[in-house]
């Protein structure tokens, strides 16, 4: 009999119930008990959704981030937060979000933990912090409470934890300690945890070690053997879980670890399955991730079964089936969608549907395909409908793609020639100030957008409301003394969705939300077909904003690589081809802005780095087509037009040469959480163009002081000539409140003025 299980379920709720509860709690609108009740209700719903599974993951729920949960479970709490008097949950949120100075009686100020991408996804985790003083201590109360709640509901529980080697690999040393020196003390705490789980009657534990799909150095492979030789002494059965790629050179040693089962991502590592079967001993389970946990397309059940049947014959009861990875990365339930085109909806599957597919696969293997004849036939119809649909294919787009050449990606002159012309045109001071694009999305803005969608506001009324917001943004920026302005993006719900809604080849869900970090959710658009731009997308808003000021106004566009990486992407052609289609559509927009005298244009590539394959040996192929797509989108303009790009959360040191090849006149980057550490690369690499290192963390409510900004920029000036430095926040300001924005930007402008005097 085939066993089916899941690796993780979306946390946020069908209608983002967790998001709204968190934000109410943070604003003191509900009590902690009410927040905990929301979490309890959601967990019960999740477990009910998974009631056909043989093993259900528990411990995958999180109030903010599962890596931060692991840090607290292991007692690895940053010293700046460990001695606060409030309860554990509030301390947890302070590490995640930071805490500003409030008043004289409550002086505690906490810096937020550093946040970075979870492997190559659009999820962000709070980076564990290590030092010579790190002392692990088991604090498993929250996990144990979840397990007991699930057991009381009759759930067959499989707890989920991040494995010890991956946990160390994900973290950052604060004093240059070798992270692997902490392995022995860390494994002791895992042993204690497993002992506690045995007392709860737990048979299997899921231990996530996704770094198995990366290129591990020998010392990390040795660490695996060392850790699992100890953990194998526990009576609990260990399911070692990898995902997001292939094992390759880690396959042999992973199969030889003293574990009871191994899960692989069979979507990406299908070619390794037979070698795994041959390499695993006969007493070990092989779990195959056969349903894609990263995308929203239906599984081709017929083709999958054809492949699985001989494997089932070989493995029999040793075969487990699961999604390729946690379903954290897909929306909750397709049945919530009532407005999607019927054909397109028939091609999709969200988390609930993926578990149904898993159940059908198991039934077909265990009871024969005759038991699911109707379901298989319906699935075949949907797969064929997508393959041949005229909604998907556009001959004109394919013809334009065929004509793309390298010349399209080249500027007329090099940066040194361009910057002279741009300096004369804009006449900006040293340390010019700007923001990244968005300003606070107030309740009034969201309400207007909502009413417009429902038809309660006419197009004219909506336009006037948005223009009023733009006017206010421009007035605020002029009053603050910023040098290069933005229109504030009140008309944009999301930087990808806004553009996708205006491009053919995209479709949008109502409730297709996924978690990005904490309470921040995104609704990735769905690329189902060939992409083109029917008409200008930003022109009216930007030109209106420019009419309100004599200062330069930045045009704001999301770049092709970010559009791709933050969308659910069609799976019937190479991603590089889809990205090039996007770049041509964006190029048309850039040229229209320039024709309308918008001569500073920012093309955001916030997600460039997250598209990198997890194995460095595969990076160059990705970077070649990604940088080409960016250059095609940006480089049709004249030398006087200044092109900016922005990258948030991008640890770009190892791709700095590729970023330089983008040839943007100005790049703005996230650096404040890392204390300008990201700029170390410029000791070795002479970056030729202009840079705006972010001077404060917009994800935290903390207000930066003038002195802190001056200090950060002085650090930056050690690496970059001051004539090529800009002053800006880390990222857009849409999630902040106006009072925070005004205070922070006031200090930023004052700091810039002080720097000019020096």
From Swiss-Prot:
Which free-text remark accompanies the cofactor? Binds 1 zinc ion per subunit.
- Which of this chain's residues are annotated to bind L-methionine? 436-438, 489, 604
Necessary cofactors: Zn(2+)
Enzyme superclass (EC): transferase
Instruction: Say yes or no: keyword Translocase present.
Output: no
GO BP term, pick one: methylation
Query: Which pathway, per its entry?
Result: Amino-acid biosynthesis; L-methionine biosynthesis via de novo pathway; L-methionine from L-homocysteine (MetE route): step 1/1
Q: Which keywords fit this entry according to its UniProt record? A: Amino-acid biosynthesis, Metal-binding, Methionine biosynthesis, Methyltransferase, Repeat, Transferase, Zinc
- Which residues does the Swiss-Prot or TrEMBL record annotate as the active site? 699
Q: Name one GO molecular function term.
A: zinc ion binding
Which residues are 5-methyltetrahydropteroyltri-L-glutamate-binding?
16-19, 117, 520-521, 566, 610
Query: Which EC number applies?
Result: 2.1.1.14
Q: Where, in this chain's numbering, is L-homocysteine bound?
A: 436-438, 489, 604
Catalyzed chemical reaction(s): 5-methyltetrahydropteroyltri-L-glutamate + L-homocysteine = tetrahydropteroyltri-L-glutamate + L-methionine
Cross-referenced CDD domains, in alphabetical order?
A: CIMS_C_terminal_like, CIMS_N_terminal_like
Q: What does this protein do?
A: Catalyzes the transfer of a methyl group from 5-methyltetrahydrofolate to homocysteine resulting in methionine formation.
Q: Which family does it belong to?
A: Belongs to the vitamin-B12 independent methionine synthase family.
State the name under which the record lists this protein: 5-methyltetrahydropteroyltriglutamate--homocysteine methyltransferase
Which gene name does the record give?
A: metE
């Amino acid at each position: 009999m085939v066993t089916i299980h899941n690796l993780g379920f979306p946390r946020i709720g069908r209608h983002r119930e967790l998001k709204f509860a968190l934000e109410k709690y943070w604003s003191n609108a509900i009590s902690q008990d009410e927040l905990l009740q929301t979490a309890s209700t959601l967990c019960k719903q999740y477990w009910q959704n998974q009631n056909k599974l043989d093993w259900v993951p528990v411990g995958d729920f999180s109030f903010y981030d599962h890596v931060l949960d692991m840090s607290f479970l292991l007692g690895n709490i940053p010293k700046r937060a460990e001695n606060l008097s409030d309860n554990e949950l509030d301390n947890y949120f302070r590490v995640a979000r930071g805490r500003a100075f409030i008043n004289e009686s409550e002086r505690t100020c906490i810096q937020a933990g550093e946040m970075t991408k979870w492997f190559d996804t659009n999820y962000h985790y709070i980076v564990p912090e290590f030092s010579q003083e790190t002392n692990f201590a088991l604090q498993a109360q929250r996990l144990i409470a979840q397990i007991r709640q699930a057991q009381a509901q009759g759930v067959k529980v499989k707890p989920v934890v991040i494995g010890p080697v991956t946990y160390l690999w994900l973290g950052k040393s604060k004093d240059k300690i070798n992270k692997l020196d902490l392995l022995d003390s860390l494994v002791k705490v895992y042993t204690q945890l497993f002992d506690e789980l045995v007392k709860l009657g737990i048979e299997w534990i899921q231990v996530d070690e996704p770094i198995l799909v990366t290129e591990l150095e020998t010392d990390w492979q040795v660490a695996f053997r060392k850790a699992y030789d100890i953990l194998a002494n526990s009576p609990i059965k260990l399911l070692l879980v990898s995902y997001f790629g292939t094992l390759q050179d880690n396959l042999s040693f992973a199969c030889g670890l003293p574990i009871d089962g191994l899960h692989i991502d069979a979507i990406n590592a299908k070619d390794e399955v037979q070698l795994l079967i041959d390499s695993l001993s006969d007493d070990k389970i092989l779990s195959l991730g056969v349903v894609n946990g990263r995308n929203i397309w239906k599984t081709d059940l017929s083709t999958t079964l054809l492949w699985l049947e001989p494997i089932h014959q070989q493995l029999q009861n040793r075969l487990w089936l699961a999604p390729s990875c946690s379903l954290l990365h897909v929306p909750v339930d397709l049945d919530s969608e009532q407005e999607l085109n019927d054909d397109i909806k028939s091609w999709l599957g969200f988390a609930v549907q993926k578990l149904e597919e898993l159940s059908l696969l198991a039934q077909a293997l265990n009871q024969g395909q005759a038991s699911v004849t109707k379901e298989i036939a319906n699935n075949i119809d949907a797969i064929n409908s997508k393959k041949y649909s005229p909604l998907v294919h556009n001959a004109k787009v394919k013809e334009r793609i065929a004509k793309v050449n390298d010349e399209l990606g080249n500027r007329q002159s090099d940066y040194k020639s361009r910057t002279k012309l741009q300096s004369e045109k804009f006449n900006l001071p040293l340390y010019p100030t700007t923001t990244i694009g968005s300003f606070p999305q107030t309740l009034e803005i969201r309400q207007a957008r909502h009413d417009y969608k429902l038809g309660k506001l006419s197009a004219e009324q909506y336009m006037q409301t948005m223009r009023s917001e733009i006017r206010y943004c421009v007035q605020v920026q002029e009053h603050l003394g910023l040098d290069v302005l933005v229109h504030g993006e009140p008309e944009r719900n999301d930087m990808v969705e806004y553009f996708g809604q205006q491009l053919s080849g995209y479709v949008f869900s109502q409730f297709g939300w996924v978690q990005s970090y904490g309470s921040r959710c995104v609704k990735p658009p769905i690329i189902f077909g060939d992409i083109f731009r029917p008409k200008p997308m930003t022109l009216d808003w930007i030109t209106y904003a420019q009419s309100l000021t004599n200062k330069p106004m930045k045009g704001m566009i999301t770049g092709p690589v970010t559009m791709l990486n933050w969308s659910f992407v069609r799976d019937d052609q190479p991603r590089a081809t889809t990205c090039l289609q996007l770049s041509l559509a964006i190029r048309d927009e850039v040229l229209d802005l320039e024709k309308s005298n918008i001569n500073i244009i920012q093309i955001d590539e916030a997600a460039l780095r997250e598209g990198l394959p997890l194995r460095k040996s595969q990076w160059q192929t990705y970077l070649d087509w990604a940088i080409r797509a960016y250059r095609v989108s940006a480089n049709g303009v004249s030398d006087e037009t200044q092109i900016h790009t922005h990258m948030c959360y991008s640890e770009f040191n190892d791709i700095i040469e590729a970023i330089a090849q983008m040839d943007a006149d100005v790049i703005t980057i996230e650096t404040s959480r890392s204390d300008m550490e990201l700029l170390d690369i410029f000791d070795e690499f002479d970056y030729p163009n202009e840079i705006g290192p972010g001077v404060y963390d917009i994800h935290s409510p903390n207000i930066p002081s003038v002195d802190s900004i001056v200090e950060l920029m002085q650090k930056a000036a050690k690496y970059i000539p001051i004539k090529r430095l800009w002053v800006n926040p880390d990222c857009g300001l849409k999630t902040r409140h106006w009072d925070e924005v005004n205070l922070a930007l006031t200090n930023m402008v004052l700091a810039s003025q002080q720097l000019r005097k020096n």
